[in-house]
């Protein structure tokens, strides 16, 4: 049992006062003459006045000391009685205190201006740009759940995009968001990029190799690719994927070094003789040179990995394949104690039929890069990801909603975005991007599996980024991130949740449980008929879901639920997008004047002038690094 320290101190002081009163009355009693009855009579009649006239007397006697202790102990006994017999009453919330939030509580999260906010519902907003007191400060991650036709794009994504208060990355599975909204962003000075996985011939280029800076980056990129290109056979036996990964790591690392050659032993010795200042200046120059080469398109591509795989085969009367010669020459120049050669050595451990099978699996794994449009899309990068946290940017990722063939590209895209912007925030901006970057993950289940996504929802928050996973039902998230119940971590890292309705029973139950229970009064009546009829009436309190699963399922089409961390749930109307002040600047159909017919071809985009006159090297005809 827990006792209150403050209350104990209070009763101790009262005990001292009561004990002192007993002490004074004892001294008065002993000072009187006469029999016992006379003394008590005088004490009761005059004792109070005499104590008040001369309150302070600390001349304790043995008898007065005993009565002082008696008064003190009596008060302590009162304290113990009250504490041990104390009952905890919470009238009206005995079985739960869940309730709907009020309009006043909604306004706690509003920003100074409407344009600073994220629109969650008609009268529910969460500030994106303004700093709030700690009790109303929430992270900006938002989970959105809604079935087909519930308004995920129309009621939530579109109105928040046209708030134009951040850089935005949005997945567009079917709504032609780029065409409908692109002109508005261009007119407001945004740089606009479109990665179109439906019509790859009309798309910006995306090459994740442009953003590779470390061996960990390379390994992570390949892991994303392999995880999102698994067939049913490789799921049952991971050996072939792991063996294939060994070969691809070696090839990819070789290509990275081909375009940005590592330092030779002689160069490392020479650098070791430099002073610390000279060495730091050298590193800055080298980093700048690497960035310049990447701007000129000097980085590998997945299609080149596919080409190198083909050079593993040997011709007639050929002792070594072209690829073996390439790696031998690499080892002569850079040694064998490096990431490239260690992976190549691991691959060479496979012999005979196992080796042939590994090559066959790897060839099949990269067969998609025989498609010309895929080769063109991934050859050169025009997305310029490192500008998104510095300049207002609008990036559309157009994905097919009925074909998962190129899901690996969307997974690679987001993995690269998180990795690149997080590193940029940490290194270039000491922790936070200058401009907020928000990612709208519409059709989240169709994007592909992003490694450590649960952790990303936590880490990007501090970098001035936010994630908005958008789901049709809770099962989509549970199915994609079921390992170690990562889906719970993802939802837990979203301080806001918007439910727009749907028709999934499991989601009804999930939302009902999330809303909690309330305490209600129940009146029971009974009546019996007969010769001696009687009746009774009783009242009791019971627990009840704030909204039962069937009530969640039967919400009106224009209603939604908004849960903000540490607040009662808000039941509100969905936002009326057509009333947004910028809605009139959007297009609705192709014949509208505001419709943006973008034409993009990354291979035809003019690069920096220093590309002119540059000799493009063909790996298939080179046997060594130059």
What are these regions (language model features)?
Residues 49, 54-55, 65-116, 215-225, ...:
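Short alpha-helical interface patches
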Residues 457-561:
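Conserved ATP-driven motor cores of ASCE-family P-loop NTPases powering translocation/secretion/packaging/pilus
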Residues 5, 15, 19, 34, ...:
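Residue-identity detector for glycine
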Residues 1-150, 154-157, 201, 517, ...:
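Basic- and hydrophobic-enriched, low-structure N-terminal and domain-boundary segments
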Residues 22, 27, 133, 138-465, ...:
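P-loop NTPase motor domains
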Residues 3, 10, 45, 121, ...:
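Compositionally biased amphipathic helical and low-complexity segments enriched in hydrophobic
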Residues 6, 186-187, 208-211, 525, ...:
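Low-complexity, intrinsically disordered or weakly predicted helical/coil tracts enriched
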């Amino acid at each position: 049992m827990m006792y209150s320290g403050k209350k104990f101190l209070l009763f101790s002081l009262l005990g001292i006062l009561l004990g002192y009163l007993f002490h004074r009355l004892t001294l008065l009693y002993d000072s009187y003459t006469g029999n016992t009855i006379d003394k008590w009579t005088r004490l009761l009649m005059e004792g109070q006045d005499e104590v008040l006239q001369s309150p302070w007397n600390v001349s304790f006697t043995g008898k007065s000391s005993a009565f002082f202790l008696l008064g003190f102990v009596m008060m302590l006994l009162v304290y113990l009685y009250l504490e041990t017999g104390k009952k905890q009453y919470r009238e009206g919330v005995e079985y739960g205190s869940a309730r709907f939030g009020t309009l006043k509580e909604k306004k706690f999260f509003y920003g100074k201006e409407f344009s600073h906010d994220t629109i969650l519902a008609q009268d529910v907003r969460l500030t994106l740009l303004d700093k709030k007191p700690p009790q109303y400060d929430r992270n900006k991650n938002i989970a959105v759940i809604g079935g087909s036709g519930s308004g995920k794009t129309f009621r939530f994504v579109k109105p928040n995009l046209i708030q134009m208060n951040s850089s935005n990355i949005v997945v567009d599975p079917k709504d032609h968001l780029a065409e409908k909204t692109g002109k508005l962003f261009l007119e407001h000075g945004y740089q606009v990029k479109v990665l179109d996985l439906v019509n790859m011939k009309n798309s910006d280029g995306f090459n994740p190799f442009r953003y590779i800076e470390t061996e960990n980056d390379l390994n992570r990129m390949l892991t994303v690719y392999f995880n999102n290109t698994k067939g049913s056979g490789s799921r049952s036996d991971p050996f072939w994927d792991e063996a294939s990964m060994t070969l691809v790591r070696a090839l990819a690392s070789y290509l990275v070094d081909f375009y940005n050659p590592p330092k030779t032993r002689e160069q490392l010795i020479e650098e070791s003789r430099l002073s610390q200042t000279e060495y730091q200046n050298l590193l800055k120059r080298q980093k700048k040179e690497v960035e310049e080469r990447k701007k000129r398109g000097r980085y590998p591509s997945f299609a080149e990995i596919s080409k190198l795989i083909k050079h593993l085969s040997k011709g007639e009367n050929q002792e070594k394949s072209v690829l073996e010669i390439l790696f031998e020459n690499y080892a002569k120049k850079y040694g064998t104690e490096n990431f490239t050669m260690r992976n190549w050595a691991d691959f060479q451990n496979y012999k005979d039929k196992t080796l042939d099978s590994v090559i066959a699996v790897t060839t099949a794994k990269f067969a998609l890069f025989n498609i010309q449009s895929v080769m063109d899309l991934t050859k050169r990068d025009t997305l310029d990801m490192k500008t998104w946290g510095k300049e207002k940017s609008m990036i559309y990722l157009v994905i097919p909603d009925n074909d998962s063939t190129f899901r690996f590209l969307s997974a690679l895209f987001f993995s690269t975005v998180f990795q690149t912007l997080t590193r940029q925030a940490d290194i270039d901006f000491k922790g936070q991007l200058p401009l907020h970057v928000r990612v709208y993950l519409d059709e989240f289940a169709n994007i592909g599996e992003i490694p450590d996504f649960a952790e990303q929802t936590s880490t990007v928050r501090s970098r001035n980024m936010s994630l908005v996973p958008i789901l049709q039902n809770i099962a989509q998230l549970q199915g994609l991130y079921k390992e170690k119940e990562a889906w719970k971590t993802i939802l837990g890292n979203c301080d806001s949740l918007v439910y727009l309705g749907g028709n999934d029973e499991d989601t009804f139950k999930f939302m009902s449980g999330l809303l909690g229970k309330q305490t209600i009064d129940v009146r029971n009546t009974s009546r019996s008929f007969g010769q001696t009829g009687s009746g009774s009436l009783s009242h009791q309190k019971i627990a009840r879901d704030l909204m039962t699963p069937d009530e969640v399922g039967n919400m009106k089409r224009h209603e939604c639920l908004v849960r903000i961390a540490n607040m009662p749930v808000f039941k509100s109307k969905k936002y009326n997008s057509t009333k947004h002040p910028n809605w009139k600047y959007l297009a609705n159909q192709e014949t509208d004047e505001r419709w943006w017919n973008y034409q993009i071809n990354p291979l035809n985009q003019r690069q920096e002038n220093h590309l002119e006159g540059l000799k493009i090297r063909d790996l298939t005809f080179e046997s060594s690094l130059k």
